[in-house]
Amino acid sequence: YGEITHTLNAIREGITHVPDATLCLNADCSLTSSLADDVPNKVVWFGVDVPIYKETAFELSDAVYCIHCKTEYEYDYRTYSHLGGFRCPKCGYHRQTPQVGVTQVVRTGADSSDIVLNAFGHNHDVHINLPGGYNIYNAAACVAAAEIVGIDEDTAVDALSRFECGFGRAEQFELGKSKARMMLVKNP
């Protein structure tokens, strides 16, 4: 599978074969945002407009330097690692304004999160029936993708509070006298 830039370049190559496809891209990721460069595809951007947590790990960044000019990025805020309000002080490459953006993280918990989501100019109070900051991103991505395929935004937003994980994804179980949660993740 290889490193992240190999995967990014494979996706970039694939996009060249589908110029009529609408891309659903994370505005907070300087790497995936670059997929919109120099292609005719329409893009629906999603992102998180505010920090998710009070403290986060920035030293784990997958993208410290600008993908275009190799200058270190500056940030208005970060959500996690290299995700957030990035901008390059040298060439001007920057975060796009998302059409679907989390404007407030009301609560993050062990089982769920509550957010305010602005989707195409409409604010929604959203309960995400899954834990984790990455699921806040997933929720925004789902509403953006739903728009692309013609599902109305109210239906998409409502589904977020009713969604339940499949086997092994945030599954809770008892292990002896203790409670445990299984979090399966994948890396490139």
Which positions does each model-derived feature cover?
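Extended acidic/charged loop-beta regions that coordinate divalent cations
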Residues: 1, 34-125
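Short, conserved loop/helix-junction motifs that constitute active-site signature segments
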Residues: 14-19, 36-40
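Short, polar loop motifs at secondary-structure junctions
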Residues: 27-31
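Short glycine/threonine-rich catalytic loop with a Thr-x-Gly-x-Asp
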Residues: 58-64, 130-141, 167-168
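A conserved, hydrophobic alpha-helical segment in the catalytic core
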Residues: 83-97, 130-161
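Gly/charged, well-structured mid-domain segments that form the phosphate/adenylate-handling core
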Residues: 93, 107-110, 145-181, 185
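A short glycine/serine-rich beta->alpha loop
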Residues: 125-133, 179-181
